């Protein structure tokens, strides 16, 4: 029995090493440049004109390593889902019906690049090298205890976050669709990037409509902890 167990462990290890070697043999940078760059900005800077924002096809990726978590990237690249329910630029997806504006869901599609596990790992590895070196690290400890009630009051009543972002509290989902959904932001986003984005949205995207709101470090930290807890 012991030898069977050791043999099984050895086989599992060999399989893992084989997968790692396969992933390392795949050129993630080449895939990003050939498959992603046609829609995503992978070199920067972000658009500085309204026209540039309107022409943006997909979110910028030139700071993906600062923004995302690698495990989420690997999973998402294998099965892309819609994160922005009104599209990257909602004005490009508005239709008028009965005198009212609405979002046309038929024009909003998930990313077409559905990669194998090995390719997803290679692409994620490359994306994680695309970082903003000026972003502070370790600003927020995601394991820190915080008041859920205070955080919910802040994000839903004192600040306009739910006007653009979908939020989830238990089984209840609230909020708008013009911004990226935050219902699983804890899996997707680096807490330090969340904090930095709240602190100065225009640093990351000069023409974003997300407002820069002055607040204390404690409130910004509270928002970051709440958003990071959304899984």
Give names to the regions the model predicted.
Residues 1-4:
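Positively charged n-region of N-terminal signal peptides that target proteins for export
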Residues 7-16:
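Bacterial N-terminal signal peptides
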Residues 17-25:
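Sec/Tat signal peptide C-region and signal peptidase I cleavage site
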Residues 24-45, 136-168:
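Sequence/structural segment immediately N-terminal to covalent heme-attachment motifs in c-type
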Residues 29, 43-76, 90-102, 166-196, ...:
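Gly/Gly-Pro-rich "capping" loops immediately C-terminal to redox-active cysteine motifs
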Residues 33, 38-46, 66, 78-81, ...:
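Detector for the c-type heme attachment site
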Residues 70-78, 82, 120-124, 191-199, ...:
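An amphipathic alpha-helix signature
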Residues 98-138, 211-231:
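C-terminal capping alpha-helices of c-type cytochrome domains
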């Amino acid at each position: 029995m012991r030898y069977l167990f050791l043999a099984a462990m050895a086989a599992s290890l060999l399989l893992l090493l084989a997968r790692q070697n396969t992933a390392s043999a795949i050129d993630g940078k080449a895939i990003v440049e050939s498959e992603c760059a046609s829609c995503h900005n992978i070199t920067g800077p972000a658009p500085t004109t309204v026209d540039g924002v309107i022409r943006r096809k997909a979110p910028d990726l030139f700071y993906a390593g600062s923004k995302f978590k690698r495990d989420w990237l690997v999973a998402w690249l294998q099965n892309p889902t819609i994160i922005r329910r009104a599209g990257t630029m909602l004005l490009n997806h508005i239709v008028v019906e009965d005198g009212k504006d609405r979002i046309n869901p038929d024009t909003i599609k998930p990313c077409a690049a559905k990669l194998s596990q090995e390719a997803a790992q290679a692409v994620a590895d490359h994306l994680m090298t695309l970082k903003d070196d000026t972003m502070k690290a370790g600003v927020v400890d995601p394991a820190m205890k915080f008041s859920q009630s205070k955080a919910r009051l802040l994000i839903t009543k004192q600040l306009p976050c739910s006007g653009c972002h979908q939020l989830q509290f238990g089984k209840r989902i609230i909020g708008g669709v013009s911004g990226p959904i935050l219902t699983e932001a804890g899996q997707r986003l680096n807490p330090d990037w969340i904090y930095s984005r709240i602190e100065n949205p225009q640093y990351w995207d000069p023409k974003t409509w997300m407002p820069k709101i002055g607040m204390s470090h404690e409130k910004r930290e509270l928002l970051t902890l709440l958003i990071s807890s959304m899984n």
